[in-house]
Amino acid sequence: MDLFDLTLHELHAKLKSKEVSSREATSAMLDRIAELEPRINAFITVTPERALAEAEAADRRIAAGEADVLTGIPLAVKDIFLTEGTLTTCGSRILNNFIPPYSATSFEKLKQRGMVLLGKLNQDEFAMGSSNESSASGPCRNPWNTDCIPGGSSGGSAAAIAARQATVTLGTDTGGSIRQPASHCGCVGLKPTYGRVSRYGVIAYASSLDQVGPLTRDVTDCAIMLGALAGHDPKDSTSVDRPVPDYQAALTNDIRGLRIGLPREYFIEGLDPDVQASMDQAIETYRRLGAEFTEISLPHTDYAVASYYLIATAEASANLARYDGVRFGHRAEQAEGLLEMYSRSRSQGFGSEVKRRIMLGTYALSSGYYDAYYLKAQKVRTLIMADFIQAFEGVDLILTPVAPTPAFRIGEKVNDPLQMYLSDIFTIPVNLAGTCAMSLPAGISGQGLPIGVQLIGKPFGEETILRAAHAFEQATEWHSLRAPL
């Protein structure tokens, strides 16, 4: 087996036994990236010199007996995470020359434990998109079919896992941006509960919705990564100060008596037949493992997408006001006066999807429309939260599709924003409710594209999700399938 094929826990065992070195594993990954990038475009920036230096430092730690499970493991992160001294663009022209002076807490935690940064991953511009087509660095492609999108906005994070270009990756999830790409690329993607992982140093899209999470090849790796990322951060007032469980200890495979809800609103007319078939197979697998199913209702699901796109764009309008060309990022030349410089810098620096969302958010917050749009959307969000609270009174987990269809072709929906937005119809409610959810490989379409199912847990119920996901993984082979590169 090639070194780039190993999971995190498999590579750790070989590093610990000194069967391989971190430098060897890192070199194998860098060679893989160089080989496949012309076809996949998963990376915006590759950092070979930094990676090899960090790998050699990790090997010294391992030799000194100071290593843990993450030391020497090759990692790549979405280009939304600040990485001190390394270009961070957020997929946008407006940040095409931005070198941050500090690092995101989530990345810094992994760096301190000896992980090796391979580079920064492609994404939709400012995490605004469901297909990775809005990136200023060009679209990322799905390793299972390079004519198809990998999902978004963390498309590069999922594609790099599927293409074996990184052992693990980091992404962010505002309305499904970890789970939808994970489903389309056949990997595991977890959106933790809001506040479980620090957002400090992550470029903000919608601050009340954004959350950091891992994308991995299997559930064990996901549990390891979540344990490393979770915890209170005094630099992030929205991070929650509560103990971090031993997530690996939750992987018991015993789910007898687990109560799983099936929300009737998610099994809609128009659901792709292959997605429905994968859901049916997943339900049958869980029944064999001893889980009990109950039909539930999440009655305000139909209003989730509209509510989300008012709240998220309103927050984006405020968050992106800081990009004006003055202190950092793209600055327009030949502007006559300050206001024209602001206008030209933003017009040249932002792409069309970002401009669309800024305009929508500004409109929703404007005088005379605030009550009708933004305030009403927040009221709907409260109702969606209440739906989940009520549903979880009778079940332990909720099982749903991740996306209505498998990955679609590049360019298919780029001129139809509404159809693009509906790609996240099953993932958005989780962000509005602030709870946790995972995408888990569960099938292959007739066209050979991966299909995931979504496990939704109670707030801070990641242990239950991981237990159920691991049991499913051990009973199936979907996670072990490889993209035909």
From Swiss-Prot:
Assigned keywords, A-Z: ATP-binding, Ligase, Nucleotide-binding, Protein biosynthesis
Entry superkingdom: Bacteria
Reaction it catalyzes: L-glutamyl-tRNA(Gln) + L-glutamine + ATP + H2O = L-glutaminyl-tRNA(Gln) + L-glutamate + ADP + phosphate + H(+)
Cysteine pairs bridged by disulfides in the record: none
Enzyme nomenclature, EC number: 6.3.5.7
InterPro entries in the record: Amidase, Amidase_CS, Amidase_dom, AS_sf, GatA
GO molecular function, one term: ATP binding
SUPFAM superfamilies given in the database record: Amidase signature (AS) enzymes
Keyword Manganese: no
Gene Ontology CC annotation, any one: glutamyl-tRNA(Gln) amidotransferase complex
Subunit text: Heterotrimer of A, B and C subunits.
Protein family according to the UniProt entry: Belongs to the amidase family. GatA subfamily.
Role according to the record: Allows the formation of correctly charged Gln-tRNA(Gln) through the transamidation of misacylated Glu-tRNA(Gln) in organisms which lack glutaminyl-tRNA synthetase. The reaction takes place in the presence of glutamine and ATP through an activated gamma-phospho-Glu-tRNA(Gln).
Name of this protein: Glutamyl-tRNA(Gln) amidotransferase subunit A
Lineage start: Bacteria, Pseudomonadati, Thermodesulfobacteriota, Desulfuromonadia, Desulfuromonadales
